[in-house]
Amino acid sequence: MDLIEITPRDFDVDIALAYATPENFTGAPVYRTAVCYLHRQAAAALREAANAARALDLRLRIFDAFRPTEAQWMLWTHTPDPDFLADPRRGSPHSRGVAVDLTLLDATGAPLPMGTEFDAFTPLSHHGNQDIPAATQHNRLLLLGLMTQAGWDFYRNEWWHYQLFDSRQYPLFGDEALPKPMM
């Protein structure tokens, strides 16, 4: 298995997995255990982005990374919206370990304003939305630049979502494949 655990100490990132708490669009925890995994190639790209952020006196905060296929089904059953969630019958980049949902923190640990909260299923979350303030656009573009220069692709509907290119080439994983189960 090519999934490795992402820890704050090893990657110098902040981890706040939204689906391990009730603070997500379902209103209930989806993960029983807050463990952050990524495919080893995605982990290398995350490390590069984290290093670039650190050079600007910023840090990455991860809201979600690997998502077991069972969790993708739970989210889809709750909100089957193909503009914001991958249909689990096709497979999500998250369930392949090659996607990450994240934001930027300033030097004090405060999140930079991004115009919406994570998982706000609204057009205001789209990259390039002109209905958010210019300073907020700047923050989104800063995140976009850090991630794309590190080898990530973006999803146009979600300012927080990045995935490796050619994500479908990676296999899907369920909870049973993990060294420390999440579900």
Regions found by a protein language model. Name each.
Residues M1-A65, T77-N157, F165-M183:
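Extracytoplasmic cell-surface/polysaccharide-interacting catalytic and binding patches
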Residues Y162:
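Conserved metal-phosphate-binding beta-hairpin within the catalytic cores
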Residues P68:
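Segments that shape or occlude catalytic/ligand-binding pockets
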